[in-house]
UniProtKB/Swiss-Prot annotation:
It catalyses: 4-CDP-2-C-methyl-D-erythritol + ATP = 4-CDP-2-C-methyl-D-erythritol 2-phosphate + ADP + H(+). Keywords: ATP-binding, Isoprene biosynthesis, Kinase, Nucleotide-binding, Transferase. Pathway: Isoprenoid biosynthesis; isopentenyl diphosphate biosynthesis via DXP pathway; isopentenyl diphosphate from 1-deoxy-D-xylulose 5-phosphate: step 3/6. This is 4-diphosphocytidyl-2-C-methyl-D-erythritol kinase. The active site is at residues 12, 137. One of its GO terms (molecular function) is 4-(cytidine 5'-diphospho)-2-C-methyl-D-erythritol kinase activity. Gene3D superfamilies: 3.30.230.10, GHMP kinase, C-terminal domain. It comes from Pseudomonas paraeruginosa (strain DSM 24068 / PA7). The gene is ispE. It is an enzyme of class 2 (transferase). Its EC number is 2.7.1.148. InterPro entries: GHMP_kinase_C_dom, GHMP_kinase_C_sf, GHMP_kinase_N_dom, IspE, Ribosomal_Su5_D2-typ_SF, Ribsml_uS5_D2-typ_fold_subgr. The keyword ATP-binding applies. GO terms for biological process: isopentenyl diphosphate biosynthetic process, methylerythritol 4-phosphate pathway; terpenoid biosynthetic process. Catalyzes the phosphorylation of the position 2 hydroxy group of 4-diphosphocytidyl-2C-methyl-D-erythritol.
Length: 282
């Protein structure tokens, strides 16, 4: 008998991003601080007995078998030896190439949903290790806690930080992470810092100058948002954000922005809404 489950795939913000150097394998050593948003995609799962993995929602420009959702399901199927399959539907709300984790979050939600639906009983560490094979940001979503990240982003230290409201502006661009990290003008020698330093305000996003230069839409969004609040790029962008002490103030600034700018207001959270939902499942 088919079993159904619906779960959120929350957005995240990089509250800062420092690049410490480039490794011999081409990846970059970095430090960043992840916090979740109570806003994201929604995925719907229904088990099937024939072992097939089917995503019924098409994403423009992304082939079915290349979608991280499908890849996550299949890599878990292979690693666990499960003979079960799944039908998946996606309510897509997060932009692609936005720097707020849409694809990685969808993959993490898929891993955790199927761990539950297929009765695998995998622990957090095992799921996170598998998630890392899909992308450096996937483990933070599978673990579901705000975290100070190091290495290529996979070394996570949970943190308890303020949970403000955020106004996130979504420029209509698709930023290529690979292009940003290969840009010759990217800062790659930032000194390592402590979480305390970040919370005191002494931090930045090393990718921001490169993204602003390559994508005028992002630069213009930052200029507009900076009129009202200290604004910053998240990840490699193109989304930019500012923080507020309450929803009313975030909504007030949102209403002042030009109509053509896509944006949303969401609460920051140190425990992802995915994990809050999982805790309610028996």
């Amino acid at each position: 008998m088919a079993v159904r489950l619906s779960l959120p795939a929350p957005a995240k913000l990089n509250l800062f991003l420092h690049i410490l150097g480039r490794r011999a394998d081409g990846y970059h050593e970095l430090q960043t601080l992840f916090q979740f948003l109570d806003h994201g995609d929604e995925l719907h799962f229904e088990t099937r007995e024939d072992g097939q993995v089917r995503l019924h929602t098409e994403i423009a420009g992304v082939p079915h078998d290349g979608n991280l959702i499908v890849r996550a399901a299949r890599v878990l199927q292979e690693a666990s030896g499960s003979t079960q399959g799944v039908d998946i539907w996606l309510d897509k709300r997060l932009p692609m190439g936005g720097g707020i984790g849409g694809g990685s979050s969808d993959a993490a939600t898929t891993l955790l949903a199927l761990n539950h639906l297929w009765n695998l009983g995998w622990d957090e560490d095992r799921i996170a290790a598998l998630g890392l094979r899909l992308g450096a940001d996937v483990p933070v979503f599978t673990r579901g806690r705000a975290a100070f990240a190091e290495g290529v982003g996979e070394k996570l230290t949970p943190v308890d930080i303020p949970e403000p409201w955020y106004l996130v502006v979504v420029p209509q661009v698709l930023v290529s992470t690979a292009e940003i990290f290969s840009d010759p003008l990217l800062t790659r020698d930032s000194p390592a810092i402590k979480v305390r330093t970040v919370l005191e305000g002494d931090s930045r996003n090393d990718c921001q100058p490169v993204v602003e230069r390559r994508y005028p839409e992002v630069r213009n969004a930052l200029i507009l948002l900076n009129k009202f609040v200290s604004a910053r790029l998240t990840g490699t962008g193109g989304c930019v954000f500012g923080s507020f002490p309450n929803k009313a103030e975030a909504d007030k600034v949102s209403a002042l922005l030009p109509d053509h700018l896509q944006r949303f207001v969401a609460k920051g959270s140190n425990v992802s809404m995915l994990h809050r939902k999982l805790e309610t499942l028996v």
